[in-house]
Amino acid sequence: MHCAENCIFCKIIAGDIPSAKVYEDEHVLAFLDISQVTKGHTLVIPKTHIENVYEFTDELAKQYFHAVPKIARAIRDEFEPIGLNTLNNNGEKAGQSVFHYHMHIIPRYGKGDGFGAVWKTHADDYKPEDLQNISSSIAKRLASS
């Protein structure tokens, strides 16, 4: 397991900073966000220090994403939210403030629960052939990796 010296999440993994632990295995740690957006708002982190989604190895992704649905189901079953958001930000411009990959699991309880994710769509800006060109360029990149 690789950790970064000044990373707050690595310090939580090491036990240097306390947390309200929800789940732990050899590769993953989940704990309550200290700034609860809603009751049960949980952060899920890999124990290996990676900054963003681009740094996942196939093996680490398998281990990490094996745990996420289990944690989400436990939150659902315990608190019976009407829905659930999973969210992560990659890069400062995308809103990432802690540069250790993490996913927020945010239970939703209805209007006024404190969470709002709003974005503007641009469906009118893209013709069907534009979408085909974009999808083709991504598919080619995937095929070459």
Curated annotation (Swiss-Prot):
Q: Where is the HIT domain?
A: 8-116
Q: In the record, what terms sit under GO molecular function? A: catalytic activity
Which InterPro entries does the record match to this protein?
Answer: HINT, Histidine_triad_CS, Histidine_triad_HIT, HIT-like, HIT-like_sf
A Pfam match: HIT
Q: Name one GO biological process term.
A: nucleotide metabolic process
Annotated motif Histidine triad motif, positions? 100-104
Q: What is this protein called?
A: Protein hit
Natural source organism: Bacillus subtilis (strain 168)
Question: Lineage in the entry?
Answer: Bacteria, Bacillati, Bacillota, Bacilli, Bacillales
